[in-house]
Amino acid sequence: TALPQLRLPATSRILCAGVLEGGIDTCNR
């Protein structure tokens, strides 16, 4: 999945994935 947040550090990506799994789409925010 190519997200505009790809520029964020790997840590942010992992946090994003964790949040996405929780059901909250914080990545798109």
Swiss-Prot record:
Enzyme class: hydrolase
GO cellular component: extracellular region
Single GO molecular function: toxin activity
Record EC number: 3.4.21.-
Organ and tissue specificity: Expressed by the venom gland.
Function: Thrombin-like snake venom serine protease.
Description of how the protein assembles with itself and partners: Monomer.
Descriptive protein name: Thrombin-like enzyme collinein-2
